[in-house]
């Protein structure tokens, strides 16, 4: 499904070097490491927001290394949900698709939230809206950049379980980056420590 070969990137120092990642259909990988080690940069390279120094990325057997981000069909969920406060929940979902809003909101546990103002949402609700929007675009892979870290522990645990179950039911492969090893163990099928990729 997603095949990353010999990915390398450095700024003042090496972030990752000749890193290989293979992700099968429905598989969830967690990438761990301390803050500032390059986890977010890796996700940005995979989805096309940053350039690699070297290496190749394949999706369903097709090379996408030099493809623009908008044609890769890779979803990205951030630590802080990127929502537009002047739009309703449904208005935010319309940025991904004009259809199936009710179904998407039911899927993420927010039935009936379509007409809500975004500024009235809690942190967990906002993250669920961002997830619904990402999934409405039917991404071939979903990348998650510490989406649970800003939530309290009980809310974070529920969201981890709900998002994992949803991704598994859709057979959507995903990569989570986190510095929290417990979170990684709960959410993923396997774990990669990014520091291990630096040779």
Where are the model-predicted features located?
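ABC ATPase NBD coupling module
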Residues: 63-80
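Conserved ABC ATPase "signature" region
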Residues: 100-113, 119, 164-168
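Conserved ABC ATPase signature
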Residues: 117-121, 125
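Hydrophobic anchor residue at the start of the ABC signature
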Residues: 131
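Catalytic Walker B motif of ABC-type/P-loop ATPase nucleotide-binding domains
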Residues: 142-146
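Conserved H-loop
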Residues: 171-177
């Amino acid at each position: 499904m997603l095949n990353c070969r010999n990915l390398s990137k450095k700024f003042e120092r090496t972030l990752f070097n000749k890193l290989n990642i293979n992700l099968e259909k429905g598989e969830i990988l967690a990438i761990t490491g301390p803050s500032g080690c390059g986890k977010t940069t890796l996700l940005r390279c995979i989805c096309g927001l940053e350039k690699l120094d070297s290496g190749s990325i394949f999706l369903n057997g097709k090379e996408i290394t030099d493809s623009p981000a908008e044609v890769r069909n890779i979803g990205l969920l951030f630590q802080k949900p990127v929502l537009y406060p002047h739009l309703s929940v449904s208005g935010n979902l319309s940025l991904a698709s004009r259809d199936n809003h009710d179904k998407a909101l039911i899927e993420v546990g927010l039935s009936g939230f379509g007409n809500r103002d975004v500024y009235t949402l809690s942190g967990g609700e906002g993250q669920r809206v961002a997830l619904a929007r990402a999934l409405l675009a039917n991404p071939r892979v979903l990348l998650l950049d510490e989406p649970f870290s800003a939530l309290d522990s009980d809310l974070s645990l529920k969201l981890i379980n709900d998002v994992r179950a949803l991704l598994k039911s859709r057979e959507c492969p995903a990569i989570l980056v986190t510095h929290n090893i417990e979170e990684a163990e709960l959410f993923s099928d396997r774990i990669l420590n990014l520091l291990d990729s630096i040779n």
